[in-house]
Amino acid sequence: QFDAAALKAATPLGKGLGASPGAACGKVVFTAEDAEEWNARGEKVVLVRLETSPEDITGMKASQGILTVRGGMTSHAAVVARGMGTCCVSGCGDIAMDEENKKFTLAGKEFHEGDYISIDGTTGNIYDGAIKTVDATIAGEFGRVMAWADKYRTLKVRTNADTPADAKKARELGAEGIGLCRTEHMFFEEDRIAAFREMICSDTVEEREAALEKILPYQQGDFEALYEALEGNPVTIRFLDPPLHEFVPTEEADIEKLANAQGKSVETIKNIIASLHEFNPMMGHRGCRLAVTYPEIAKMQTKAVIRAAINVQKKHADWTVKPEIMIPLVCEVKELKFVKKVVVETADAEIAAAGVNLEYEVGTMIEIPRAALTADEIATEADFFCFGTNDLTQMTFGFSRDDAGKFLNAYYDTKIFENDPFAKLDQNGVGKLMETAIKLGKPVNPKLHVGICGEHGGDPSSVEFCHKIGLDYVSCSPFRVPIARLAAAQAAISNK
């Protein structure tokens, strides 16, 4: 947090959305690579981007704070920053960005690479220069209040975590499992992105499988580390979700490197990259649609999940390691049936080959309205439902979470909306779809367990709604776990 006296003396230059709380001060950098490089030599940096994407992960980790021109409360930058406990201000549309020349203008002032800037992830305020920061503290009463909360709540609280470090932090803050592990973030590490790009640019199934075989040990290692961190608590692993264009290189040097590795011309690689372009990627070739087109991806991920679980279970006989495999973006039961068949055949073969007993579950995310409306059909094939309320909100409202920031302020000013539907669950519309899905799904499959893993899982009023409609758990960013625990207790008491 900022030093109170220093903050009082400062005047904000501009304002975005307070997307991830905290305070950050550092030198401006414009690329993830620069953030890593500067951080490695001991510089504190603030990463400034038009918007972030999964390939920026390593640079985001190296930054004190993140500032984006585009995006709302559930944009990539906001969600990832909250998960890492990194300060983030998103959607500051007043910034005029000049990425090519590594500079931007805000309130008439020009900022260049290396200039100091301070951002407040709670208020969304942006300041010129360096403001002194002090470490945030947790008072001794925290543990006592949390113990009271745990005594009364009936909702379980899990976390959204992709790394053992995030999982460990969430466990310290009281999380009872992982409700969402986004496997795509694991592909961006330096040693595996090359193999994944090789897979994308392959011409045949055999070539794709050979590239995926290189990634398998890395992915398996990631899952083993997560299972170790969770000590037998549940881990829900979402299979590959983003469209493939997010993984391909954009820099000329990286394209040449990929062409050389593939033994293809730069022109051919550029054509492959161009072919991945989509007009609306959010509703394009992503989620389970990737697993239908390329079942070999789902096979590789299943092998990694199951092998990791078997290894960790063998090491810790007193733990119950029961993988939960989550298929994203399902809108039709036959889709789930198709992907589930691939998963089950692969998993059962792995378990048989190892000569062990291992239980696992296959469930789905409910993030498309049609999935909620046909939940009675989908429940016949799913062991669990998890509401991905970030996508369910944008699909229900029909506006993109990354573009909504441009007009939502006008909606608040004119009182069309009272709240940001991406931050506070829309109970009348999105909530009604959730209720419908539960009412349709549970009678068909009484063992169905249901959770939520959108950012709403850390919002108190949304948590109360989840309690009311009978969810089993909420899952949120690690640093929001205490809020969810408290909100779940308040919901239990007020709804007695």
Say what each PLM segment does.
Residues Q1-A35, N39-K44, R49-E176, L180-C181, ...:
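Acidic, glycine-rich flexible loop/linker segments
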Residues I138, W148-K496:
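Conserved alpha/beta-domain cores
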